[in-house]
Amino acid sequence: NKIIGTNSDFAVFSFYATKNITCGEGGAIILNNKNHYENIKSISNNGMTKPAMKRFENNKYSHWDVITKGFKANLSDINASLLEKQIKIYDQKMIKRKKIYDNLYKKISNIKSITLPISNSNVLRDYHLFPIGVDVKKRDKLISFLNKNHIQVTVNYRSITELTYYKKKYKFQCSVSEKWGQQTLSLPFHLKINKKDIDYIYSKLNSFFRR
């Protein structure tokens, strides 16, 4: 019964535009060490000791300093303001996302040429994407076919061992992730998908594999 992010020293969450909780661009780091917390705050604000809002407190001005190399990576107030309401209704949205996911899963599971990820009943999912696996030789043809039929699909995740930078830097293989990365594509999945959409996606997938 542990929440994700509580089993490690650090956990990183993305609030990118396509995520279930979004502020357009940005993210959050959760950690359990005060020293690391202060360091990360500084690094994310150009290595400064104090952000602008902290330089004048208790009627006294505090001069700032730069104590380390840093980045301009702190979240703006405007971006942050978009998160509060979404977090409050997160559980409510997840119920709807799960229902859509289950309906799509049930429909597509009838197509034997498609591999679907196995869910663990002991783990609560976020239902972020709907990835499927297909024959490597047919994957890119299926992507073109679906896009021509106005079903926008994409490949979200590839094995990093097959990406040029990491392939050159690290000499190792991850056979399972490589195999899945070559087979996978993500179907449309969002809160506005309805039964008609699911039936249409299914019909096009079915027609492709019946050819």
Identify the meaning behind each predicted range.
Residues 34-211:
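PLP-dependent aminotransferase class I/II
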Residues 20-24, 123-126:
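Short glycine-enriched loop/turn motifs at secondary-structure junctions
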Residues 14, 27-33, 84:
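Short beta-strand-to-turn element immediately C-terminal to the catalytic PLP-Schiff-base lysine
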Residues 1-23, 62-67:
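Conserved active-site segment immediately N-terminal to the catalytic lysine
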Residues 2-7, 29, 171-173:
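Short, hinge-like loop/turn segments at secondary-structure boundaries
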